[in-house]
């Protein structure tokens, strides 16, 4: 199923580590390529958070985080050790994973809070008709949060790779 979605989003498969960029133009091209990859995989992450299967989004997000980091490294022609020597990446991965896992919980809490406000402000009959929309609101919030954190993780990693290259 993921292959079908991956094909629809036209996500580039990065098979081999490239050479190090030697000019600013090559660096700019690598950034564009990496940012496109991060955007598409972030969309995939947000899509997984919409599916109402417990822990599915968490498993997909863990795989996507690993894939994004490995693919961005390959795009820039770097290996894991070169990038990790710059900062404490493991701590950031754990925090990102926790944030993404929490996105579904936050979405539910936002939905519950919205439901309480509507019930207080609108007659019970009207509120009862509107409650059917709240699961969708929670899923939309969850998807937005998941996209944001996955995108942030990818962009931060792109910046780290560029710092490493500029320091070489």
Where are these regions (language model features)?
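N-terminal, intrinsically disordered, low-complexity segments
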Residues: 6-10
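Alpha-helical membrane association modules
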Residues: 11-168
């Amino acid at each position: 199923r993921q292959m079908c979605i991956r094909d629809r989003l036209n996500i580039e498969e990065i098979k081999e580590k490239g050479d190090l960029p030697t000019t600013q133009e090559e660096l700019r091209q690598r950034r564009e390529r990496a940012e496109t990859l991060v955007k598409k995989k972030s969309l995939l992450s947000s899509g997984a958070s919409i599916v109402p299967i417990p822990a599915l989004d968490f498993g997909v997000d863990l795989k996507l985080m690993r894939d994004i980091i490995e693919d961005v490294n390959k795009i820039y022609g770097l290996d894991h050790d070169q990038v990790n020597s710059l900062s404490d990446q493991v701590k950031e991965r754990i925090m990102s994973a926790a944030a993404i896992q929490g996105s579904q919980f936050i979405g539910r809490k936002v939905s519950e809070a919205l439901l309480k406000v509507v019930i207080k402000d609108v007659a019970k009959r009207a509120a009862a008709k509107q409650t059917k929309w709240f699961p969708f609101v929670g899923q939309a919030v969850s998807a937005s949060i998941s996209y944001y954190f996955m995108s942030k993780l990818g962009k931060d990693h792109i910046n780290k790779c560029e710092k490493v290259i500029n320091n070489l």
